[in-house]
Amino acid sequence: MFKELALIGTTASGKSDLAFELAKEFEGVILSLDSLALYKEIDIASAKPKSWQLEAVRHFGVDEIYPDEEFSVGAFFEIYKNAKEIARLRGCPLIITGGSGFYLKAMLSGLAPDVPKCELNLSNEEIYELALQNDPEFAGKFSQNDSYRLEKWYQIYKFSGQIPSIWLRENTKPSVIKELAIFEILWDKDELRARIAKRTKNMLDEGLIDEAKFLFEKYKSEPKPLKSIGLKECKQFLEGEISKNELETLIATHTAQLAKRQRTFNRSQFEKKFVGDLAQTRSEILKFLKG
Protein backbone atom coordinates (compact mmCIF):
# COMPACT_ATOMS: atom_id res chain seq x y z
CA MET A 1 0.00 0.00 0.00
CA PHE A 2 1.25 3.48 -0.86
CA LYS A 3 1.99 5.65 2.15
CA GLU A 4 4.54 8.42 2.53
CA LEU A 5 6.42 9.50 5.61
CA ALA A 6 9.43 11.57 6.56
CA LEU A 7 12.11 10.25 8.88
CA ILE A 8 14.24 13.13 10.12
CA GLY A 9 16.97 13.66 12.68
CA THR A 10 20.41 15.14 12.99
CA THR A 11 23.42 13.81 11.19
CA ALA A 12 24.63 10.49 12.70
CA SER A 13 21.21 9.81 14.25
CA GLY A 14 20.78 6.49 12.44
CA LYS A 15 17.92 7.61 10.20
CA SER A 16 19.45 6.31 6.95
CA ASP A 17 19.98 2.81 8.35
CA LEU A 18 16.47 2.73 9.78
CA ALA A 19 15.00 3.98 6.50
CA PHE A 20 16.85 1.23 4.62
CA GLU A 21 15.69 -1.44 7.08
CA LEU A 22 12.05 -0.32 6.74
CA ALA A 23 12.26 -0.01 2.96
CA LYS A 24 13.60 -3.57 2.76
CA GLU A 25 10.86 -4.90 5.03
CA PHE A 26 8.03 -3.15 3.18
CA GLU A 27 9.61 -3.18 -0.31
CA GLY A 28 9.56 0.60 -0.27
CA VAL A 29 11.26 3.45 -2.07
CA ILE A 30 13.61 5.96 -0.42
CA LEU A 31 13.91 9.65 -1.26
CA SER A 32 17.12 11.09 0.20
CA LEU A 33 16.99 14.61 1.61
CA ASP A 34 20.77 14.73 1.97
CA SER A 35 22.08 17.76 0.10
CA LEU A 36 25.52 16.13 -0.40
CA ALA A 37 24.43 12.61 -1.37
CA LEU A 38 22.93 14.22 -4.48
CA TYR A 39 26.40 14.40 -5.96
CA LYS A 40 28.20 11.64 -7.79
CA GLU A 41 31.77 10.95 -6.59
CA ILE A 42 31.09 12.36 -3.10
CA ASP A 43 30.51 9.02 -1.42
CA ILE A 44 32.31 8.87 1.92
CA ALA A 45 31.96 12.55 2.85
CA SER A 46 28.20 12.34 2.32
CA ALA A 47 27.83 9.05 4.24
CA LYS A 48 25.98 7.88 1.14
CA PRO A 49 24.28 4.46 1.24
CA LYS A 50 26.65 1.67 0.16
CA SER A 51 26.43 0.34 -3.40
CA TRP A 52 24.74 -2.87 -2.20
CA GLN A 53 22.09 -0.80 -0.42
CA LEU A 54 21.45 1.25 -3.54
CA GLU A 55 21.02 -1.99 -5.48
CA ALA A 56 18.72 -3.55 -2.87
CA VAL A 57 16.36 -0.56 -2.48
CA ARG A 58 15.35 2.02 -5.08
CA HIS A 59 16.78 5.40 -4.02
CA PHE A 60 15.99 8.84 -5.39
CA GLY A 61 18.03 11.95 -4.61
CA VAL A 62 21.32 10.01 -4.65
CA ASP A 63 23.97 10.33 -7.39
CA GLU A 64 21.77 12.70 -9.39
CA ILE A 65 24.41 15.18 -10.63
CA TYR A 66 28.15 15.92 -10.57
CA PRO A 67 29.64 18.36 -8.02
CA ASP A 68 30.14 21.15 -10.58
CA GLU A 69 26.55 21.04 -11.88
CA GLU A 70 23.83 23.44 -10.77
CA PHE A 71 20.95 22.24 -8.61
CA SER A 72 17.86 23.91 -7.20
CA VAL A 73 15.03 23.15 -4.81
CA GLY A 74 12.73 23.22 -7.83
CA ALA A 75 14.76 20.37 -9.34
CA PHE A 76 14.38 18.49 -6.06
CA PHE A 77 10.60 18.89 -6.34
CA GLU A 78 10.77 16.99 -9.65
CA ILE A 79 12.84 14.21 -8.08
CA TYR A 80 10.21 13.91 -5.34
CA LYS A 81 7.41 13.69 -7.92
CA ASN A 82 9.25 10.89 -9.75
CA ALA A 83 9.85 9.00 -6.50
CA LYS A 84 6.19 9.34 -5.51
CA GLU A 85 5.01 8.13 -8.92
CA ILE A 86 7.18 5.01 -8.70
CA ALA A 87 5.99 4.28 -5.14
CA ARG A 88 2.35 4.71 -6.21
CA LEU A 89 2.80 2.39 -9.18
CA ARG A 90 4.41 -0.24 -6.96
CA GLY A 91 1.85 0.28 -4.19
CA CYS A 92 4.63 0.64 -1.62
CA PRO A 93 5.77 3.19 0.99
CA LEU A 94 7.82 6.25 0.08
CA ILE A 95 10.27 6.99 2.90
CA ILE A 96 11.68 10.52 2.77
CA THR A 97 14.80 10.80 4.90
CA GLY A 98 17.91 12.91 5.36
CA GLY A 99 19.41 15.87 7.13
CA SER A 100 18.38 18.70 4.81
CA GLY A 101 15.23 19.90 6.52
CA PHE A 102 15.21 22.87 4.14
CA TYR A 103 14.15 20.62 1.23
CA LEU A 104 11.40 19.04 3.32
CA LYS A 105 10.14 22.42 4.53
CA ALA A 106 10.03 23.71 0.96
CA MET A 107 8.02 20.68 -0.20
CA LEU A 108 5.51 21.22 2.61
CA SER A 109 5.29 25.02 2.54
CA GLY A 110 6.11 25.94 -1.04
CA LEU A 111 9.12 27.61 -2.58
CA ALA A 112 9.68 31.35 -2.67
CA PRO A 113 11.51 32.65 -5.76
CA ASP A 114 15.13 33.68 -5.50
CA VAL A 115 15.65 37.34 -4.72
CA PRO A 116 18.98 39.05 -5.43
CA LYS A 117 20.86 40.25 -2.38
CA CYS A 118 21.10 43.97 -1.81
CA GLU A 119 23.30 46.19 0.32
CA LEU A 120 22.02 46.33 3.88
CA ASN A 121 22.33 49.95 4.95
CA LEU A 122 19.91 49.61 7.87
CA SER A 123 20.21 47.97 11.27
CA ASN A 124 17.95 45.12 12.37
CA GLU A 125 16.00 47.59 14.50
CA GLU A 126 15.48 49.96 11.55
CA ILE A 127 14.39 47.13 9.24
CA TYR A 128 11.96 45.90 11.89
CA GLU A 129 10.48 49.41 12.28
CA LEU A 130 10.09 49.61 8.50
CA ALA A 131 8.34 46.22 8.50
CA LEU A 132 6.12 47.28 11.40
CA GLN A 133 4.94 50.31 9.42
CA ASN A 134 4.57 48.65 6.01
CA ASP A 135 4.04 44.95 6.69
CA PRO A 136 2.57 44.36 10.17
CA GLU A 137 1.64 40.80 9.15
CA PHE A 138 5.33 39.97 8.90
CA ALA A 139 6.40 42.04 11.89
CA GLY A 140 3.89 40.23 14.08
CA LYS A 141 5.57 36.88 13.42
CA PHE A 142 9.24 37.68 14.03
CA SER A 143 11.36 39.61 16.50
CA GLN A 144 13.88 42.30 15.65
CA ASN A 145 16.64 39.87 16.67
CA ASP A 146 15.86 37.50 13.79
CA SER A 147 18.59 38.77 11.45
CA TYR A 148 18.03 36.15 8.75
CA ARG A 149 14.32 36.84 8.25
CA LEU A 150 14.70 40.59 8.56
CA GLU A 151 17.36 40.59 5.86
CA LYS A 152 15.19 38.42 3.60
CA TRP A 153 12.24 40.77 4.18
CA TYR A 154 14.33 43.81 3.30
CA GLN A 155 15.72 42.16 0.16
CA ILE A 156 12.20 41.37 -1.08
CA TYR A 157 11.03 44.89 -0.15
CA LYS A 158 13.83 46.52 -2.16
CA PHE A 159 13.63 44.06 -5.07
CA SER A 160 9.85 44.01 -5.56
CA GLY A 161 8.81 47.43 -4.33
CA GLN A 162 5.81 45.68 -2.79
CA ILE A 163 4.74 44.52 0.66
CA PRO A 164 6.81 41.31 1.08
CA SER A 165 4.03 39.26 2.74
CA ILE A 166 1.71 39.92 -0.20
CA TRP A 167 4.47 39.47 -2.79
CA LEU A 168 5.44 36.09 -1.31
CA ARG A 169 1.84 34.84 -1.37
CA GLU A 170 1.53 35.81 -5.03
CA ASN A 171 4.90 34.46 -6.17
CA THR A 172 5.63 31.39 -4.04
CA LYS A 173 5.59 28.05 -5.85
CA PRO A 174 2.88 25.88 -4.24
CA SER A 175 3.77 23.02 -1.95
CA VAL A 176 4.03 19.52 -3.41
CA ILE A 177 3.03 17.72 -0.19
CA LYS A 178 -0.19 18.61 1.61
CA GLU A 179 0.00 16.24 4.57
CA LEU A 180 2.88 14.13 5.78
CA ALA A 181 3.56 11.92 8.78
CA ILE A 182 6.89 13.08 10.23
CA PHE A 183 9.01 11.06 12.65
CA GLU A 184 12.15 12.45 14.32
CA ILE A 185 14.94 10.47 15.98
CA LEU A 186 16.30 12.33 18.99
CA TRP A 187 19.49 11.43 20.85
CA ASP A 188 20.95 12.60 24.14
CA LYS A 189 23.63 15.22 23.40
CA ASP A 190 26.54 13.16 24.77
CA GLU A 191 25.39 9.99 23.01
CA LEU A 192 25.13 11.87 19.73
CA ARG A 193 28.63 13.30 20.13
CA ALA A 194 29.95 9.77 20.66
CA ARG A 195 28.14 8.58 17.53
CA ILE A 196 29.56 11.50 15.55
CA ALA A 197 33.10 10.74 16.78
CA LYS A 198 32.73 7.09 15.80
CA ARG A 199 31.34 7.94 12.38
CA THR A 200 34.12 10.44 11.74
CA LYS A 201 36.76 7.81 12.53
CA ASN A 202 35.01 5.29 10.26
CA MET A 203 34.89 7.79 7.39
CA LEU A 204 38.62 8.42 7.68
CA ASP A 205 39.29 4.67 7.85
CA GLU A 206 37.19 4.17 4.71
CA GLY A 207 39.35 6.61 2.73
CA LEU A 208 37.88 10.09 3.16
CA ILE A 209 41.26 11.76 2.61
CA ASP A 210 41.79 9.94 -0.71
CA GLU A 211 38.27 10.86 -1.81
CA ALA A 212 38.93 14.51 -0.97
CA LYS A 213 42.27 14.46 -2.81
CA PHE A 214 40.59 13.06 -5.92
CA LEU A 215 37.81 15.67 -5.80
CA PHE A 216 40.12 18.65 -5.29
CA GLU A 217 42.39 17.47 -8.12
CA LYS A 218 39.45 16.96 -10.50
CA TYR A 219 37.46 20.10 -9.64
CA LYS A 220 40.00 22.93 -9.58
CA SER A 221 37.24 25.55 -9.32
CA GLU A 222 36.18 24.01 -5.99
CA PRO A 223 32.38 24.08 -6.43
CA LYS A 224 30.20 24.59 -3.36
CA PRO A 225 29.82 20.85 -2.47
CA LEU A 226 33.60 20.66 -1.94
CA LYS A 227 33.29 23.22 0.86
CA SER A 228 31.18 20.80 2.90
CA ILE A 229 32.12 19.38 6.30
CA GLY A 230 34.61 16.56 5.88
CA LEU A 231 36.01 17.85 2.61
CA LYS A 232 37.01 21.36 3.66
CA GLU A 233 38.93 19.97 6.66
CA CYS A 234 40.64 17.39 4.44
CA LYS A 235 41.79 20.24 2.22
CA GLN A 236 43.43 21.86 5.24
CA PHE A 237 45.15 18.56 6.01
CA LEU A 238 46.29 18.04 2.41
CA GLU A 239 47.76 21.55 2.38
CA GLY A 240 49.67 20.83 5.59
CA GLU A 241 47.70 23.27 7.75
CA ILE A 242 46.55 20.67 10.30
CA SER A 243 47.66 17.24 11.54
CA LYS A 244 45.77 13.94 11.14
CA ASN A 245 44.57 14.12 14.75
CA GLU A 246 43.44 17.72 14.30
CA LEU A 247 41.63 16.67 11.13
CA GLU A 248 39.55 14.07 12.96
CA THR A 249 38.81 16.45 15.83
CA LEU A 250 37.81 19.30 13.51
CA ILE A 251 35.44 17.17 11.44
CA ALA A 252 33.77 15.81 14.58
CA THR A 253 33.45 19.31 16.09
CA HIS A 254 31.99 20.84 12.93
CA THR A 255 29.62 17.89 12.54
CA ALA A 256 28.39 18.34 16.12
CA GLN A 257 27.78 22.03 15.41
CA LEU A 258 25.82 21.08 12.29
CA ALA A 259 23.76 18.60 14.31
CA LYS A 260 22.83 21.36 16.75
CA ARG A 261 21.64 23.59 13.89
CA GLN A 262 19.66 20.72 12.37
CA ARG A 263 17.96 19.97 15.69
CA THR A 264 17.02 23.63 16.13
CA PHE A 265 15.63 23.79 12.58
CA ASN A 266 13.60 20.60 12.97
CA ARG A 267 12.20 21.77 16.29
CA SER A 268 11.12 25.16 14.93
CA GLN A 269 9.91 24.17 11.46
CA PHE A 270 8.09 20.86 11.96
CA GLU A 271 5.66 21.20 14.84
CA LYS A 272 3.40 18.22 14.10
CA LYS A 273 5.64 15.18 14.39
CA PHE A 274 6.49 12.17 16.53
CA VAL A 275 9.74 12.54 18.46
CA GLY A 276 11.48 9.62 20.18
CA ASP A 277 14.66 7.60 20.46
CA LEU A 278 15.67 5.15 17.74
CA ALA A 279 13.63 2.21 19.08
CA GLN A 280 10.55 4.32 19.79
CA THR A 281 10.67 5.92 16.36
CA ARG A 282 11.01 2.54 14.66
CA SER A 283 8.01 1.23 16.62
CA GLU A 284 5.83 4.23 15.71
CA ILE A 285 6.72 4.00 12.02
CA LEU A 286 5.87 0.28 12.00
CA LYS A 287 2.46 1.11 13.48
CA PHE A 288 1.95 3.76 10.81
CA LEU A 289 2.95 1.47 7.93
CA LYS A 290 0.90 -1.47 9.17
CA GLY A 291 -2.15 0.63 10.07
Curated annotation (Swiss-Prot):
Monomer. It holds the Pfam family IPPT. The gene is miaA. It comes from the Bacteria. ATP binds at G9, T10, T11, A12, S13, G14, K15, S16. Catalyzes the transfer of a dimethylallyl group onto the adenine at position 37 in tRNAs that read codons beginning with uridine, leading to the formation of N6-(dimethylallyl)adenosine (i(6)A). Residues 34-37 are annotated as: Interaction with substrate tRNA. GO terms for biological process: tRNA modification. Gene3D superfamilies: Crystal structure of tRNA isopentenylpyrophosphate transferase (bh2366) domain (1.10.287.890), P-loop containing nucleotide triphosphate hydrolases (3.40.50.300). Belongs to the IPP transferase family. One of its GO terms (molecular function) is tRNA dimethylallyltransferase activity. Keywords: ATP-binding, Magnesium, Nucleotide-binding, Transferase, tRNA processing. Its EC number is 2.5.1.75. It is an enzyme of class 2 (transferase). This is tRNA dimethylallyltransferase. InterPro entries: Dimethylallyltransferase (IPR039657), IPT (IPR018022), P-loop_NTPase (IPR027417). SUPFAM superfamilies: P-loop containing nucleoside triphosphate hydrolases (SSF52540). PANTHER family: TRNA DIMETHYLALLYLTRANSFERASE.
